[in-house]
Amino acid sequence: MGKDRQGRGIKKGRCVASDFSVMAGIASLFWHVLFPVACPICGRAGSTGCLGCIKGVLSPSGPVCIECLNCYPCDRHTLAFPHYFGATHKGPARQLIHLLKYGHHGALGISMGRALAACLSFPLPDALVPIPLHNESPRFFNQSEKIAQGLSLELGVPVMNCLSWNVRIHPRALTKSYARSKLPEGAFKLDECRLKAGIRTVMICDDVCTTGATILGAAKTLAKGGLQVLGSASFTLAKGKK
């Protein structure tokens, strides 16, 4: 340890430590400029969501009946199609949904869809049809479409945005399961100009399934347009009152 002109000790170690902290801060800032996103689970820079991390959040337990959300096949609803989901709507899975919807992380939805693909086990459809964004939604992207895009990458099945809302329903009106189960008849319309040639069978994609009413409403509209719905899928399942 040296001395200054007045004989006081000079602790060089503090200077070195301070310099190191400054350099570390600069390096961290530079890294985040290059990679401004990070996996919400492990924190890995440059990743919008590690596929392995998201798969670790999932806990699939087989399909449910889209009519009653009980085990599929269902004795009560023999004509119902299966609904597949990645996890129940709680814990880390719920947090990912909230980050996707309210954190404006569209790329995260694609990773979530890719992870969800491993939970599906029925014949591949000709196309994936996402539930459309509500007319009054303030979001810049459709979270259901992002999940469908991820599924498309893994399954090799195209996304077909052929549905739109036929009625103006404010998103806040659908936050309660009771309201979801009371969707008006003809809530959706089929945009025939967006139908792709050769498409006969489809799978409906959504971010969260609460009562199944939204998916069932979409399925009725698709069926009227001559499309067969093989099943549906959502990242999470939040059972609500039918």
Residue ranges, per PLM feature:
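Glycine-rich phosphate/pyrophosphate-handling loop used in enzymes and phosphotransfer proteins
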Residues: 1-242
